[in-house]
């Protein structure tokens, strides 16, 4: 028997005995083809096996890209609805040059052919087999070929790990807008991203029906996917030239919500110490739910998928066997039956006693975070995007709509249907221009502010205040620039997600129609993020960007035409949501509350509605205080 045959036999036996899996010929090279991998700058030895990426030139600089690296076994069949299982090491060289699958989700097709919508839809094959990650490395970093050997070539650099948004129901790391080649080319950082399970595939929670310690439907599987990917990247950072102790998470919307959980959860605290949260924190109303609510949604899904929900108490495994036999498309469609209205997603992080042992703000308020730094922020018009989609009969994408006062009230009642009449009336009073009550265009602006403040800006402010109080070093930005070539109607302003293309450097792509000031803004944001990942501060000492505290809520303005420092943002509106409304809610159950409610309702039904907001809110304050006596 020849030496090559003996070698192949030996490797095969080792693979079977040690639990190694042989990838297909399509994804790996044969043993004889990788004997000289140490001389190949595009081959890296990871803890899972060898990977080969590809090289591209970006803005005159070379970037090495690795896409589609598996970090977990495919969560299919018996692994559906369970925590991710680490990938078995492979033999050969993995071809890391192809974009991975996107996790199962539904496409948004409200405006067919509209690029502003299509840019957020998955651009690769949709599959349950989706747990892969991507890495971008500046070529000037000498890639080493083993994760455990120290480098003698140059200092290791920070690693930025992107977590995409999409309300925990949609999104994919493969979107063009998330291509991190420009960040890698212009900043001395490595960038990575991962896929994680969405919707019921990532958040179904029915664990109470199984014995303690069971791995069945534990909830938050999508977050566990993220954790496994972060740990893989941390374990292999040095092999790519990165510093495993300088890892910063950054993400938008649900990505920001996820990051805030990883920073303070008892499971992941200490895994990373820096996070950048764009338009999303874990305390936002759309970013978490109770275990009881998650169970209720899970039962509805079981029934809608044709499985026997009555068996859950005594034969839960039979129920899950049935659910694992349901095709993915059916689950993906039926889960939306529990959508509860604007930003009322049926799958979110769940308070399940492990990753989220209690209410997010209780977790934050009870912790000590003096060794952590966070950078977070909001956009100027966070609410208009969601307002358009959920009330599409009321608004036009391309131009302003005259919102009748009656429809304004209808939208308030719909969004806040679970609040008392008194609370809803208070919202109307706070968000009314009393000098122009019947100006439909102002009503449209006000309702957009309601959505943006309640769901995004004010939860972000609240998180920042409490985090600072518990020792975190907090930096806040406010993105106020409307892109010169925005595809959305001008009335929508600076919408949710508008900052993402600047974060990833797309204005520096000269084939796109950005102006020179927007290119400068993008470069400034990338530099701020890279400096934050390196030093814990987003700017150099000669730039004024003060820390954010409750007493001094100062933020840095990101705008192509002006920069500066502001306070808030939206300080008055957020005082209403974060301070006043909870007090009103606490006292609305008293015997006198109906009197207040009746009085306010009479004012509300008045044809004039001319009480100024200061007067009306003072009346509510007085009556609330009287009720508390």
UniProtKB/Swiss-Prot annotation:
It is an enzyme of class 3 (hydrolase). Homodimer; disulfide-linked. Keywords: Cell membrane, Disulfide bond, Glycoprotein, GPI-anchor, Hydrolase, Lipoprotein, Membrane, Neurotransmitter degradation, Serine esterase, Signal, Synapse. One of its GO terms (biological process) is acetylcholine catabolic process in synaptic cleft. This is Acetylcholinesterase. A lipid is attached at residue 605 (GPI-anchor amidated serine). It comes from Leptinotarsa decemlineata. Its EC number is 3.1.1.7. One of its GO terms (cellular component) is synapse. Residues 606-629 form a propeptide.
């Amino acid at each position: 028997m020849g030496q090559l045959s003996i070698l192949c036999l030996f490797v095969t036996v080792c693979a079977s005995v040690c639990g190694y899996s042989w990838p297909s010929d399509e994804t790996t090279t044969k043993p004889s083809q990788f004997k000289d991998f140490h001389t190949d700058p595009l081959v890296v030895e990871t803890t899972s096996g060898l990977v080969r990426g590809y090289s591209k030139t970006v803005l005159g600089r070379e970037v090495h890209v690795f896409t589609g690296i598996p970090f977990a076994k495919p969560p299919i069949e018996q692994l559906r609805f369970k925590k991710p299982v680490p990938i078995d090491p492979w033999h050969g060289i993995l071809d890391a040059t192809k974009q991975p699958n996107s996790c199962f989700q539904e496409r948004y097709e409200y405006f067919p052919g509209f690029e502003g919508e299509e840019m957020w839809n998955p651009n690769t094959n949709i599959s349950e087999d989706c747990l892969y990650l991507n890495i971008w490395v500046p070529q000037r970093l000498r890639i080493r070929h083993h994760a455990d050997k120290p480098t003698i070539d140059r200092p290791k650099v920070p690693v930025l790990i992107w977590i995409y948004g999409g309300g925990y129901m949609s999104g994919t790391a493969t979107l063009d807008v998330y291509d991190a080649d420009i960040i890698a080319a212009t900043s001395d950082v490595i960038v990575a991203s991962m896929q994680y399970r969405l919707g019921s595939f990532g958040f179904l929670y029915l664990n109470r029906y199984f014995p303690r310690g069971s791995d069945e439907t534990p909830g938050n599987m999508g977050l566990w996917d993220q954790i496994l990917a972060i740990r893989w990247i941390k374990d292999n950072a040095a092999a790519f030239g990165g510093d495993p102790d300088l890892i910063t998470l950054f993400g938008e919307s649900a990505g920001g919500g996820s990051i805030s959980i990883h920073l303070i959860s008892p499971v992941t605290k200490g895994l990373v110490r820096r996070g950048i949260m764009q338009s999303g924190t874990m305390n936002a109303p759309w970013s978490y739910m109770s275990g009881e609510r998650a169970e209720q949604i899970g039962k509805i899904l079981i029934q809608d998928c044709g499985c026997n929900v009555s068996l859950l108490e005594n034969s839960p495994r039979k129920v899950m066997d049935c659910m694992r036999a349901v095709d993915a498309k059916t689950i993906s469609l039926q889960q939306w039956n529990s959508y509860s209205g604007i930003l009322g997603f049926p799958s979110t992080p769940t308070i399940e006693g492990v990753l989220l042992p209690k209410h997010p703000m209780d977790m934050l308020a009870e912790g000590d975070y003096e060794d952590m730094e966070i950078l977070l922020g909001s956009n100027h018009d966070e609410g208009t995007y969601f307002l358009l989609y959920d009330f599409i009969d009321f608004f036009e994408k391309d131009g302003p709509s005259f919102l009748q006062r009656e429809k304004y009230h209808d939208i308030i009642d719909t969004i806040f249907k679970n609040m008392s009449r008194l609370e809803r009336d208070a919202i109307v009073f706070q968000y009314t221009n009393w000098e122009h009550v019947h100006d439909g265009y102002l009503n449209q602006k006000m309702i957009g502010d309601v959505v943006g403040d309640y769901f995004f800006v004010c939860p972000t402010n609240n998180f920042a205040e409490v985090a600072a109080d518990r020792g975190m070093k907090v930096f806040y930005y406010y993105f106020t620039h409307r892109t010169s070539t925005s595809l959305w109607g001008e009335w929508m302003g600076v919408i949710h997600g508008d900052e993402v293309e600047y974060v990833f450097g797309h204005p520096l792509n000269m084939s796109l129609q950005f102006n020179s000031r927007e290119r400068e803004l993008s470069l400034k944001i990338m530099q701020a993020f890279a400096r934050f990942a390196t030093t814990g501060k987003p700017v150099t000492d000669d730039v004024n960007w003060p820390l954010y505290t409750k007493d001094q809520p100062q933020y840095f303005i990101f705008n192509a035409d002006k920069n500066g420092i502001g306070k808030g943002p939206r300080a008055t509106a957020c005082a209403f949501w974060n301070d006043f409304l909870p007090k009103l809610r606490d006292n609305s159950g008293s015997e006198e509350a109906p009197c207040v409610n009746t009085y306010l309702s009479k004012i509300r039904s008045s044809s004039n509605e001319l009480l100024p907001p200061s007067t009306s809110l003072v009346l509510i304050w007085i009556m609330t205080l009287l009720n508390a006596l």
